[in-house]
Amino acid sequence: MHYTGPVYRPPFEADSILVQVTVGCSHNACTFCTMYRGTRFETSRMEDIEADLREAAHDFPSVKRVFLVNADAFVLSAGRLATIAEKIHEHLPNVETIGMYASVKNVIGKSDEDLARLHELGIDGLNIGLESGLDEVLAHLNKGFTLDEARTQLARLKKAGIGYSLNIMLGAAGSELWEKNAIANAEILNETQPSLIFTALLHVDPGAPILDEVKAGTFHEDTLGQYVTEELEMLKRLELEDTVFYGLHTSNVIPVSGLLPRDKDLLVKRLENGLARIPERYLNSHPEKGYEGMSILR
Protein backbone atom coordinates (compact mmCIF):
# COMPACT_ATOMS: atom_id res chain seq x y z
CA MET A 1 0.00 0.00 0.00
CA HIS A 2 1.20 3.51 -0.83
CA TYR A 3 1.27 5.74 2.26
CA THR A 4 3.22 9.01 2.31
CA GLY A 5 3.86 10.96 5.49
CA PRO A 6 1.62 10.62 8.55
CA VAL A 7 -1.64 8.72 8.06
CA TYR A 8 -4.58 9.23 10.41
CA ARG A 9 -8.05 7.77 10.62
CA PRO A 10 -10.92 8.20 13.07
CA PRO A 11 -10.87 5.46 15.73
CA PHE A 12 -14.30 4.28 14.62
CA GLU A 13 -12.86 3.46 11.17
CA ALA A 14 -10.69 0.67 12.60
CA ASP A 15 -12.33 -1.98 10.39
CA SER A 16 -12.05 0.05 7.18
CA ILE A 17 -9.38 -0.35 4.52
CA LEU A 18 -7.32 2.84 4.23
CA VAL A 19 -6.59 3.88 0.66
CA GLN A 20 -4.44 6.95 0.09
CA VAL A 21 -5.78 9.35 -2.54
CA THR A 22 -4.14 12.56 -1.33
CA VAL A 23 -1.04 13.40 0.68
CA GLY A 24 -1.17 15.93 3.50
CA CYS A 25 -3.87 18.58 3.92
CA SER A 26 -5.04 21.08 1.30
CA HIS A 27 -5.75 23.70 4.01
CA ASN A 28 -2.98 22.95 6.50
CA ALA A 29 -3.47 26.27 8.29
CA CYS A 30 -5.56 25.53 11.39
CA THR A 31 -3.89 27.26 14.32
CA PHE A 32 -4.19 24.23 16.61
CA CYS A 33 -3.04 21.49 14.23
CA THR A 34 0.45 20.19 13.45
CA MET A 35 -0.54 16.86 11.94
CA TYR A 36 0.58 17.67 8.39
CA ARG A 37 2.78 20.75 8.90
CA GLY A 38 5.81 19.19 7.24
CA THR A 39 3.93 17.42 4.47
CA ARG A 40 3.36 19.00 1.07
CA PHE A 41 -0.16 18.52 -0.29
CA GLU A 42 -0.34 16.26 -3.33
CA THR A 43 -2.87 14.07 -5.10
CA SER A 44 -2.10 10.39 -5.56
CA ARG A 45 -1.52 8.92 -8.99
CA MET A 46 -4.38 6.81 -10.27
CA GLU A 47 -2.01 3.93 -10.99
CA ASP A 48 -0.91 3.92 -7.34
CA ILE A 49 -4.52 3.95 -6.17
CA GLU A 50 -5.38 1.02 -8.43
CA ALA A 51 -2.31 -0.90 -7.27
CA ASP A 52 -3.44 -0.44 -3.67
CA LEU A 53 -6.95 -1.60 -4.54
CA ARG A 54 -5.55 -4.75 -6.15
CA GLU A 55 -3.48 -5.40 -3.02
CA ALA A 56 -6.51 -4.80 -0.79
CA ALA A 57 -8.62 -7.13 -2.94
CA HIS A 58 -6.02 -9.86 -2.49
CA ASP A 59 -5.64 -9.42 1.27
CA PHE A 60 -9.16 -8.34 2.30
CA PRO A 61 -11.61 -9.43 -0.42
CA SER A 62 -14.65 -9.27 1.87
CA VAL A 63 -14.11 -5.76 3.25
CA LYS A 64 -17.31 -3.72 3.47
CA ARG A 65 -15.94 -0.18 3.83
CA VAL A 66 -13.07 1.85 2.44
CA PHE A 67 -11.81 5.03 4.09
CA LEU A 68 -9.88 7.36 1.79
CA VAL A 69 -6.91 9.21 3.28
CA ASN A 70 -5.30 11.74 3.92
CA ALA A 71 -6.49 14.87 5.69
CA ASP A 72 -9.31 16.04 3.41
CA ALA A 73 -9.68 13.61 0.53
CA PHE A 74 -13.05 15.18 -0.30
CA VAL A 75 -11.08 18.11 -1.74
CA LEU A 76 -10.72 16.06 -4.91
CA SER A 77 -13.08 16.96 -7.73
CA ALA A 78 -16.36 15.10 -7.96
CA GLY A 79 -15.15 13.53 -11.19
CA ARG A 80 -11.96 12.25 -9.60
CA LEU A 81 -13.83 10.89 -6.59
CA ALA A 82 -16.37 9.20 -8.87
CA THR A 83 -13.57 7.49 -10.80
CA ILE A 84 -11.95 6.30 -7.58
CA ALA A 85 -15.30 5.01 -6.26
CA GLU A 86 -15.91 3.11 -9.50
CA LYS A 87 -12.47 1.50 -9.25
CA ILE A 88 -13.14 0.56 -5.64
CA HIS A 89 -16.32 -1.26 -6.59
CA GLU A 90 -14.55 -2.92 -9.51
CA HIS A 91 -11.78 -4.36 -7.34
CA LEU A 92 -13.73 -4.75 -4.08
CA PRO A 93 -17.30 -5.70 -5.03
CA ASN A 94 -18.33 -6.28 -1.40
CA VAL A 95 -17.67 -2.66 -0.43
CA GLU A 96 -20.90 -0.95 0.60
CA THR A 97 -19.70 2.52 1.62
CA ILE A 98 -16.72 4.79 1.07
CA GLY A 99 -15.79 7.40 3.67
CA MET A 100 -13.09 10.02 4.10
CA TYR A 101 -12.14 13.17 5.96
CA ALA A 102 -13.78 16.30 4.58
CA SER A 103 -13.84 20.01 5.27
CA VAL A 104 -16.86 22.24 4.87
CA LYS A 105 -14.72 24.02 2.25
CA ASN A 106 -14.54 20.81 0.20
CA VAL A 107 -18.33 20.60 -0.10
CA ILE A 108 -18.76 24.17 -1.35
CA GLY A 109 -17.14 23.43 -4.70
CA LYS A 110 -19.43 20.52 -5.53
CA SER A 111 -22.86 20.90 -7.11
CA ASP A 112 -25.99 19.19 -5.81
CA GLU A 113 -25.76 16.89 -8.83
CA ASP A 114 -22.16 16.04 -7.92
CA LEU A 115 -23.16 15.14 -4.38
CA ALA A 116 -26.08 13.00 -5.55
CA ARG A 117 -23.79 11.12 -7.94
CA LEU A 118 -21.20 10.50 -5.23
CA HIS A 119 -23.92 9.21 -2.93
CA GLU A 120 -25.05 6.80 -5.66
CA LEU A 121 -21.48 5.50 -5.81
CA GLY A 122 -21.50 4.69 -2.09
CA ILE A 123 -19.76 7.72 -0.62
CA ASP A 124 -21.16 8.08 2.88
CA GLY A 125 -19.99 8.72 6.41
CA LEU A 126 -17.72 11.71 5.85
CA ASN A 127 -15.79 12.83 8.93
CA ILE A 128 -15.86 16.63 9.23
CA GLY A 129 -13.92 18.78 11.68
CA LEU A 130 -16.51 21.34 12.75
CA GLU A 131 -14.74 21.91 16.10
CA SER A 132 -17.05 24.65 17.43
CA GLY A 133 -20.46 26.25 17.05
CA LEU A 134 -19.06 29.77 17.53
CA ASP A 135 -17.96 31.86 14.56
CA GLU A 136 -15.36 33.66 16.65
CA VAL A 137 -13.78 30.33 17.54
CA LEU A 138 -13.82 29.09 13.94
CA ALA A 139 -12.04 32.29 12.92
CA HIS A 140 -9.53 31.98 15.75
CA LEU A 141 -8.79 28.39 14.77
CA ASN A 142 -8.49 29.50 11.12
CA LYS A 143 -10.80 26.72 9.95
CA GLY A 144 -11.48 28.48 6.66
CA PHE A 145 -15.27 28.54 6.88
CA THR A 146 -18.05 30.24 8.82
CA LEU A 147 -20.86 28.70 10.82
CA ASP A 148 -23.41 29.73 8.19
CA GLU A 149 -21.32 28.02 5.52
CA ALA A 150 -21.21 24.90 7.68
CA ARG A 151 -24.99 24.95 8.09
CA THR A 152 -25.54 25.32 4.35
CA GLN A 153 -23.08 22.67 3.24
CA LEU A 154 -24.11 20.11 5.87
CA ALA A 155 -27.72 20.55 4.77
CA ARG A 156 -26.65 19.94 1.17
CA LEU A 157 -24.89 16.73 2.17
CA LYS A 158 -27.95 15.55 4.03
CA LYS A 159 -30.21 16.37 1.08
CA ALA A 160 -27.94 14.30 -1.17
CA GLY A 161 -28.12 11.37 1.26
CA ILE A 162 -24.49 11.60 2.35
CA GLY A 163 -24.18 11.02 6.08
CA TYR A 164 -21.45 12.61 8.17
CA SER A 165 -19.88 12.65 11.60
CA LEU A 166 -18.83 15.91 13.23
CA ASN A 167 -15.75 16.48 15.36
CA ILE A 168 -16.17 18.80 18.34
CA MET A 169 -13.07 20.13 20.08
CA LEU A 170 -13.69 20.64 23.78
CA GLY A 171 -11.80 23.67 25.03
CA ALA A 172 -11.58 25.28 21.60
CA ALA A 173 -12.97 28.57 22.93
CA GLY A 174 -10.65 28.77 25.91
CA SER A 175 -11.43 28.95 29.61
CA GLU A 176 -13.30 32.28 29.46
CA LEU A 177 -15.85 31.09 26.89
CA TRP A 178 -16.27 27.41 27.72
CA GLU A 179 -19.94 27.73 28.71
CA LYS A 180 -20.87 29.83 25.68
CA ASN A 181 -19.06 27.29 23.51
CA ALA A 182 -20.90 24.35 25.08
CA ILE A 183 -24.28 25.98 24.39
CA ALA A 184 -23.35 26.91 20.82
CA ASN A 185 -22.02 23.42 20.12
CA ALA A 186 -25.29 21.86 21.26
CA GLU A 187 -27.29 24.26 19.10
CA ILE A 188 -25.44 23.48 15.86
CA LEU A 189 -25.45 19.74 16.59
CA ASN A 190 -29.20 19.79 17.24
CA GLU A 191 -29.71 21.68 14.00
CA THR A 192 -27.55 19.42 11.83
CA GLN A 193 -28.31 16.02 13.42
CA PRO A 194 -25.04 14.24 12.50
CA SER A 195 -24.85 10.46 12.52
CA LEU A 196 -21.97 10.59 15.01
CA ILE A 197 -20.37 13.19 17.29
CA PHE A 198 -16.67 12.72 17.97
CA THR A 199 -15.35 14.71 20.93
CA ALA A 200 -11.71 15.34 21.80
CA LEU A 201 -9.84 17.95 23.80
CA LEU A 202 -7.84 20.82 22.40
CA HIS A 203 -4.24 19.80 22.89
CA VAL A 204 -1.61 22.36 22.02
CA ASP A 205 1.39 20.70 20.42
CA PRO A 206 4.82 22.21 19.72
CA GLY A 207 4.72 24.00 16.38
CA ALA A 208 1.05 24.95 16.59
CA PRO A 209 0.50 28.73 16.25
CA ILE A 210 -1.94 28.70 19.16
CA LEU A 211 0.92 27.61 21.43
CA ASP A 212 2.44 31.09 21.05
CA GLU A 213 -0.81 32.56 22.37
CA VAL A 214 -0.78 30.22 25.35
CA LYS A 215 2.80 31.19 26.16
CA ALA A 216 1.99 34.89 25.76
CA GLY A 217 -1.05 34.58 28.01
CA THR A 218 -3.49 35.73 25.31
CA PHE A 219 -5.24 32.35 25.14
CA HIS A 220 -6.10 30.41 28.27
CA GLU A 221 -6.72 26.69 28.01
CA ASP A 222 -9.58 25.04 29.88
CA THR A 223 -8.76 23.57 33.24
CA LEU A 224 -9.28 19.85 33.67
CA GLY A 225 -12.62 20.49 35.35
CA GLN A 226 -13.74 22.89 32.63
CA TYR A 227 -13.07 20.32 29.91
CA VAL A 228 -15.40 17.85 31.60
CA THR A 229 -18.02 20.45 32.51
CA GLU A 230 -18.04 21.82 28.95
CA GLU A 231 -18.73 18.35 27.58
CA LEU A 232 -21.37 17.74 30.24
CA GLU A 233 -23.23 21.00 29.59
CA MET A 234 -23.17 20.36 25.84
CA LEU A 235 -24.45 16.82 26.29
CA LYS A 236 -27.31 17.93 28.55
CA ARG A 237 -28.56 20.26 25.79
CA LEU A 238 -28.40 17.76 22.94
CA GLU A 239 -31.75 16.87 21.37
CA LEU A 240 -30.85 14.29 18.76
CA GLU A 241 -32.93 11.71 16.96
CA ASP A 242 -30.38 8.96 16.24
CA THR A 243 -26.74 9.92 16.83
CA VAL A 244 -23.75 8.05 18.22
CA PHE A 245 -21.90 10.05 20.88
CA TYR A 246 -18.26 8.99 20.66
CA GLY A 247 -16.23 10.46 23.49
CA LEU A 248 -13.51 7.83 23.54
CA HIS A 249 -10.55 9.77 22.17
CA THR A 250 -7.45 9.26 24.28
CA SER A 251 -7.54 12.94 25.27
CA ASN A 252 -10.99 12.75 26.86
CA VAL A 253 -10.74 12.97 30.65
CA ILE A 254 -13.75 10.69 31.21
CA PRO A 255 -14.43 8.33 28.30
CA VAL A 256 -18.11 7.98 27.42
CA SER A 257 -19.91 6.56 24.42
CA GLY A 258 -23.48 5.69 23.56
CA LEU A 259 -26.47 6.25 21.32
CA LEU A 260 -28.52 9.41 21.65
CA PRO A 261 -31.20 9.93 22.77
CA ARG A 262 -31.37 6.42 24.23
CA ASP A 263 -28.26 6.67 26.42
CA LYS A 264 -28.29 10.39 27.19
CA ASP A 265 -29.18 10.11 30.89
CA LEU A 266 -26.59 7.37 31.35
CA LEU A 267 -23.82 9.41 29.73
CA VAL A 268 -24.73 12.51 31.74
CA LYS A 269 -24.61 10.49 34.94
CA ARG A 270 -21.22 9.00 34.04
CA LEU A 271 -19.74 12.43 33.44
CA GLU A 272 -21.27 13.82 36.63
CA ASN A 273 -20.01 10.89 38.70
CA GLY A 274 -16.58 11.04 37.09
CA LEU A 275 -16.32 14.78 37.68
CA ALA A 276 -17.25 14.32 41.34
CA ARG A 277 -14.43 11.79 41.78
CA ILE A 278 -11.67 14.03 40.43
CA PRO A 279 -9.60 15.39 43.34
CA GLU A 280 -10.00 19.13 43.90
CA ARG A 281 -6.32 19.79 43.25
CA TYR A 282 -6.73 18.59 39.68
CA LEU A 283 -10.02 20.29 38.81
CA ASN A 284 -8.50 23.76 38.52
CA SER A 285 -5.21 22.59 37.07
CA HIS A 286 -3.79 22.47 33.57
CA PRO A 287 -2.31 18.97 33.54
CA GLU A 288 0.63 17.95 31.44
CA LYS A 289 -0.47 16.47 28.11
CA GLY A 290 0.91 13.25 26.69
CA TYR A 291 0.26 11.32 23.48
CA GLU A 292 -2.59 12.89 21.47
CA GLY A 293 -3.52 15.14 24.38
CA MET A 294 -3.88 12.54 27.11
CA SER A 295 -3.93 14.24 30.52
CA ILE A 296 -1.06 13.18 32.76
CA LEU A 297 -1.91 13.56 36.45
CA ARG A 298 1.03 13.39 38.82
Kindly label every feature range from the protein language model.
Residues 1-13, 190-298:
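Auxiliary Fe-S-binding modules of radical SAM enzymes
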Residues 4-48:
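Canonical Radical SAM [4Fe-4S] cluster-binding loop centered on the CxxxCxxC motif
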Residues 17-19, 64-66, 96-102, 126-128, ...:
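Hydrophobic faces of well-ordered beta-strands that scaffold small-molecule active sites
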Residues 25, 33, 49, 68, ...:
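Conserved, mostly hydrophobic/aromatic
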Residues 58-160, 239:
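Conserved SAM/AdoMet-binding glycine-rich loop
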Residues 105, 133-137, 157-181, 200-206, ...:
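Conserved strand-turn element in the central/C-terminal portion of the radical SAM core barrel
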Residues 110-115, 174-191:
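Catalytic cores of alpha/beta
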